[in-house]
């Protein structure tokens, strides 16, 4: 209904980091850098940190940050960090929106998924993974009966259906779509299909 725009970034700049700084494991505080601006010590190039990949949770050998460069540095010719720090990955991003899924209007928040960590020629189907769950009064106090103007913990109300939409990727050969809504298809780094139009007559 209010579709979040889907975008494909085939220049998702990656920077590998040393795992420690002055003997401290940087993964302990690395999450705090998301959204912050960092500057190369030698190149003086600045970039905004967008995403982080860790060997413990992602298919990478080294701690890697993904950045958007802001300037070209002191010499006005360099556009990426120096000293072999720079690599190129690929990603897909979805903006805030509302989708009509299984008879319900479901809100989706801005999400970014890394397609290939160190390659910009990915081949994937990108879309929304649909997950259904039930939320009861044990999970949300507001579901207790409040007919008298206050929460009555002795009278739990009805459970609620929760639908969660998560941006995910699937191989081109994976055609199992029971809980998947495709919105973007990429083959060898080329966009082959993109779903961007809202079809109100189907609602």
Predicted region positions:
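Subunit-assembly interface segments of extracellular/virion macromolecular structures
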Residues: 1-203
């Amino acid at each position: 209904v209010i579709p979040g725009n889907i975008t494909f970034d085939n220049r998702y700049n990656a920077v590998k980091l040393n795992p420690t700084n002055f003997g401290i494991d940087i993964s302990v505080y690395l999450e705090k850098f998301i959204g912050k601006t960092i500057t190369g010590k030698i190149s003086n190039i600045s970039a905004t940190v967008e995403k982080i990949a860790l060997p413990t949770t992602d298919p990478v050998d080294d701690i890697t940050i993904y950045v958007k460069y802001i300037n070209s540095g002191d010499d006005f010719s360099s556009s990426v960090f120096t000293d072999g720090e720079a690599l190129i990955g690929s990603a897909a991003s979805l903006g805030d929106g509302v989708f009509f899924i299984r008879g319900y209007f479901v809100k989706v928040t801005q999400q970014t998924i890394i397609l290939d960590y160190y390659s910009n020629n990915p081949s994937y189907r990108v879309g929304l993974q649909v997950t259904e769950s039930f939320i009861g009064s044990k999970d949300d106090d507001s579901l207790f009966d409040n007919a008298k103007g206050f929460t009555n913990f002795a009278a739990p109300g009805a459970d609620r259906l929760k639908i969660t939409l998560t941006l995910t990727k699937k191989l081109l050969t994976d055609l199992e779509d029971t809980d998947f809504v495709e919105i973007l298809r990429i083959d060898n780094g080329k966009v082959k299909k993109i779903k961007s139009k809202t079809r109100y007559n189907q609602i």
